[in-house]
From Swiss-Prot:
GO CC terms, sorted: chloroplast; cytosol
Induction line: Induced by wounding, methyl jasmonate and abscisic acid (ABA). Induced by salt stress. Induced by osmotic stress. Induced by freezing. Induced by the bacterial pathogen Pseudomonas viridiflava.
UniProtKB keywords: Chloroplast, Cytoplasm, Decarboxylase, Lyase, Magnesium, Plastid, Putrescine biosynthesis, Pyridoxal phosphate, Spermidine biosynthesis, Stress response
Entry's Gene Ontology molecular function annotations: arginine decarboxylase activity; protein homodimerization activity
Summary of subunit composition and partner proteins: Homodimer and heterodimer with ADC1.
Biochemical pathway: Amine and polyamine biosynthesis; agmatine biosynthesis; agmatine from L-arginine: step 1/1
Required cofactor names: pyridoxal 5'-phosphate; Mg(2+)
This enzyme's EC code(s): 4.1.1.19
Family: Belongs to the Orn/Lys/Arg decarboxylase class-II family. SpeA subfamily.
Name of the protein described by the UniProt record: Arginine decarboxylase 2
């Protein structure tokens, strides 16, 4: 059988050729050196296009001239010197304390309260403009649904930033209503506290207590039976309630997030139930308490046409309630204001929306105005529960790719493959078929014969006929053939120091996609494509779907000797729901969290609060284990083992045993105290376990005096 040096060059990629060897086997030649490869010039603007940063990131994220991602904390109003470089934040936060850093470990959530403030102001401005331009005779007064992100400082910031325009909160459970009541004590007295969700007597009593505390609570009826409790408890507590009701509209959102809409939605009252509620309130002398109509088409409403249909239907229902004698004042359009996760500005999927904030507000105001004018009904206050649109942009998850597995082609020698010609006849026949297909340039047959040869050789390996080295040679040969015909999988697997289940649960649970981008090296051309594999022992702990319909992500090669530094990736637009939904699969706890404000320092930012991620002791305690007792048990076992070694005599041996025991105890102590994630750099010396457990472990300073940790 002749060698395959004469294969048609149109069949073989330029980087490969078949060597003319002395035997009746063919093997791949080495690829040309990298010196022969022409590297195109690259720039941050090309990376911005590649990763669609100008689409999903506008106006808060850009690729700066240094090749790093910068945050524009005030959106389009951000001045050039106010941009905040994400890589500088990472270096500040993860740097050792001895060098002025905070010594925190990745993964890391970075919160930008300035972005949060800007999102609130933009939402309010959009409605204010639509109301003024259309001559609408009322105002907009939104609420933030705390379920999106219940973090104390996020909720407190929203109340503070929105106080001047009476921005309120929405709660859907008893803990959430307690949280909201406490926070709104520092907000506007006119701000709404919208009480949604399933309710029992205790929940309703809390809402009524809120009115006694001069909070503007509104009890929204999700189920007809709740009305009896509201009437009974309000009379017992001598509180005149403000009541709303949630309607099941006929308008339905067809996407994934539309399952809560339509007549079969989880929450809300049908038209029949609404009529019964009105009658019962009239009979109880409480029809004047019914003041708010609430509905929810679904999250991520894709287009203003669907939005307008739903709002118009609800506005007609609002007018009917006015006609029936209810003292209606507010129409609560619920959530649904979407964001552009993939930068496409399209209404064709759940990942994007075909409108801007301004267009959304214009559609809502116009729909309510037209219907109310037609029925000669006074324009109501417009309320929305736009959580995703408010908090998604303000938070960035940063994590590290610690290693990469890339497909390797085994460089076989003639001797490696000679066994195919000397051994099993079926294996030889499979090899000869593959040889002939390669000579013909028959790609389809190559795929078939590669599969047959591999299967035959695997059977031989299972029977003990082939060695592991021989099986590896066959695998290498087959992979090379696939690569030569363009059928191999060139995708690398990047191992990331993260748990998908803890930090990006929606990706695993509902296939929600988020923009994932390197936060640096954007001035360099990506040299590979990769998928991301997390730390968990779970096959679902991977990211192999990306925005733009891609099954892999352009990434930079990791430097093997470490001279290129660490490689950081950012997951963006995840400020809503991800933290609230995250679990502790494999006992990987929550990431470190820092709060970063724009400042006039040399690097434009200051860390105003820093919280280390959950330690191993923290997550063990969350699962009802007792870290202190576990530590003492292991320490006692170590002490026993040291004393039962035997054969040690003299002071020196005893000192060595004591030193060994102390080292073991210290190692155990550190393991409980440190985060469960990989320690990719030398960890800072830990405090004792007992001190770590009793201490909340956060750094904090008032924003007015944060210079001591300004960058």
């Amino acid at each position: 059988m002749p060698a395959l040096a004469c294969v048609d060059t149109s069949f073989v990629p330029p980087a490969y050729a078949f060597s003319d060897t002395a035997g009746d086997v063919f093997i791949p030649a080495s690829s040309p050196t990298s010196a022969a490869v022409v590297v195109d010039r690259w720039s941050p603007s090309l990376s911005s296009s590649l990763y669609r940063i100008d689409g999903w990131g506008a106006p808060y994220f850009i690729a700066n001239s240094s090749g790093n991602i910068s945050v524009r904390p005030h959106g389009s109003e951000t001045l050039p010197h106010q941009d905040i470089d994400l890589l500088k934040i990472v270096k500040k936060v993860t740097g050792p304390k001895s060098s002025g850093g905070l010594g925190l470990q990745l993964p890391l959530i970075v919160r930008f309260p300035d972005v949060l403030k800007n999102r609130l102001e933009c939402l309010q401005s959009a409605f204010d403009y639509a109301i003024k331009s259309q001559g609408y005779d009322s105002h907009y007064q939104g609420v933030y649904p705390v379920k999106c992100n219940q973090d104390r400082f996020v909720v407190e910031d929203i109340v503070k930033f929105g106080s001047s325009f009476r921005f309120g909160l929405e709660a859907g459970s008893k803990p959430e209503i307690l949280l909201a009541m406490s926070c709104l004590c520092k907000g506007s007295p006119d701000a709404f506290l919208v009480c949604n969700g399933f309710k029992d007597a205790e929940y309703i009593s809390l809402a009524l207590l809120g009115r006694k505390l001069a909070l503007n609570t509104v009890i929204v009826l999700e189920q007809e039976e709740e009305l009896d409790l509201v009437i009974e408890l309000s009379q017992k507590m001598n509180v005149r309630p403000v009541i709303g009701l949630r309607a099941k509209l006929r308008t339905k959102h067809s996407g994934h997030f539309g399952s809560t809409s339509g007549e079969k939605g989880k929450f809300g009252l049908t038209t029949t139930q609404i009529v019964r509620v009105v009658r019962k309130l009239r009979q109880s002398g409480m029809l004047d308490c019914l003041q708010l109509l609430h509905f929810h088409i679904g999250s991520q409403i894709p287009s203003t046409s669907l939005l307008s249909d739903g709002v118009a239907e609800a506005a007609q229902l609002y007018c009917e309630l006015v006609r029936l004698g209810a003292h209606m004042k507010v129409i609560d359009i619920g959530g649904g204001l979407g964001i552009d996760y993939d930068g496409s500005k399209s209404g064709e999927s759940d990942l994007s929306v075909a409108y801007s904030l301004e267009e959304y507000a214009e559609a809502v105001v116009a729909s309510v105005r037209v219907v109310c004018d037609r029925s000669s009904v006074k324009h109501p206050v417009i309320c929305s529960e736009s959580g995703r649109a408010i908090v998604s942009h303000h938070s960035v998850l940063i994590f590290e790719a610690v290693s990469a597995d890339k497909p390797m082609v085994h460089q076989a020698t003639p001797g490696d493959i000679q066994f195919l010609l000397e051994g099993n006849e079926e294996a030889r026949a499979n090899y000869e078929d593959l040889y002939a297909a390669v000579m013909r340039g028959d790609h389809e047959s190559c795929l078939l014969y590669v599969d047959q040869l591999k299967q035959r050789c695997v059977e031989g390996f299972k029977e003990g006929v082939l060695s592991i080295e021989q099986l590896a040679s066959v695998d290498g040969l087959c992979e090379w053939v696939l690569k030569a015909i363009g059928a191999s999988d060139p995708v690398h697997t990047y191992n990331i120091n993260l748990s998908v289940f803890t930090s990006i649960p929606d990706l695993w649970g509902i296939d929600q996609l988020f923009p994932i981008v390197p936060i640096h090296k954007l001035d360099q051309r990506p040299g590979a494509r990769g998928i991301l594999s997390d730390l968990t022992c779970d096959s679902d702990g991977k990211i192999n779907k990306f925005i733009g319909g891609e099954s892999s992500l352009p990434l930079h090669e990791l430097d093997k000797n470490g001279s290129g530094g660490r490689y950081f990736l950012g997951m963006f637009l995840g400020g809503a729901y991800e933290e609230a939904l995250g679990g502790v699969h494999n006992l990987f706890g929550g990431p470190s969290v820092v709060r970063v404000s724009q400042s006039d320092g040399p690097h434009s930012f200051a860390v105003t609060r820093a919280v280390p991620g959950q330690s191993s002791a923290d997550v063990l305690r969350a699962m009802q284990h007792e870290p202190e007792l576990m530590f003492q048990t292991l320490k006692h076992r170590a002490e026993e083992m040291m004393h039962t070694k035997g054969g040690s005599e003299g002071e020196n041996e005893e000192e060595e045993e004591d030193d060994e025991f102390n080292n073991v105890a210290a190692s155990l102590d550190r393991s409980f105290h440190n985060m469960p994630y990989l320690a990719t750099e030398q960890a800072s010396p830990s405090n004792s376990l007992s001190a770590a457990i009793s201490n909340l472990g956060f750094y904090y300073c008032d924003e007015d005096v944060y210079d001591y940790i300004s960058a």
